[in-house]
């Protein structure tokens, strides 16, 4: 009797928990999908520094198409000053990209700004209300603890953030002996849209797929999220190519192929770009000295003019006499 009661209780309890199990699974999948789009995280986990020795920013390893990007910073800044670094990521807002599940959706954007050593993200209490409004909706973070001068942001909706504003705090050489009053380079990389290569090295569903060999498609099979091509080579070997949903299929079963022939179109509408500029950390003493020099020159000019007029009056008086 007790065993029967326990069996019924166990069955009822399992039935009660089943919807929660499904809900948990759905939430975990959704959470994973959201995290899978967080492309700056991949670079942060794989590279200690996003700029390689060749000068290339590592985002280009996954975002293969080249697109323009612009950076705007002041020509010069004083020490311990908050200023704006504005990254522009232009693209056609009417474009739609292939999302992770193969459907079409809007593009997102992201950027990395590699500042000189000592330059950091401005503290919240140093940011003006106007600058806070410009950075609304952006979560800007240092690349890692070892590189607080490297700032990353994204992915964020591109329709709202074609201009990414970074609030930056300049260093003070009086407090940091590694910083000097000189001209420094600033490197910027920015992308719009998803990458063509996953961090694992596999192709994403946002790129073109080609045939690896000469042969014939003997079988073309579609499942829930993958299209499988069975290609028979001239030697009789069967090679299977799996294409995730997203790209449009350009071939059909029975078709003869040559190596590197496209099996799909290229759905990518985004791309990555990098650019560099320069900024001067200006000494206040130099600025004061320059102002004093200009004042001295102007004062000398005024005195010279007054002296000249006085001399002319003396000459005129002597002539009249």
Curated annotation (Swiss-Prot):
Residues 1-38 form the signal peptide. The keyword Membrane applies. It is found in: Plastid, Chloroplast thylakoid membrane. GO terms for cellular component: chloroplast thylakoid membrane. Its main location: plastid. Gene3D superfamilies: 2.40.50.100, Cytochrome f large domain, Single helix bin. Coiled coil: none annotated. Its cofactor is heme. SUPFAM superfamilies: Cytochrome f subunit of the cytochrome b6f complex, transmembrane anchor (SSF103431), Cytochrome f, large domain (SSF49441), Rudiment single hybrid motif (SSF51246). Component of the cytochrome b6-f complex, which mediates electron transfer between photosystem II (PSII) and photosystem I (PSI), cyclic electron flow around PSI, and state transitions. PANTHER family: CYTOCHROME F, PTHR33288. Belongs to the cytochrome f family. This is Cytochrome f.
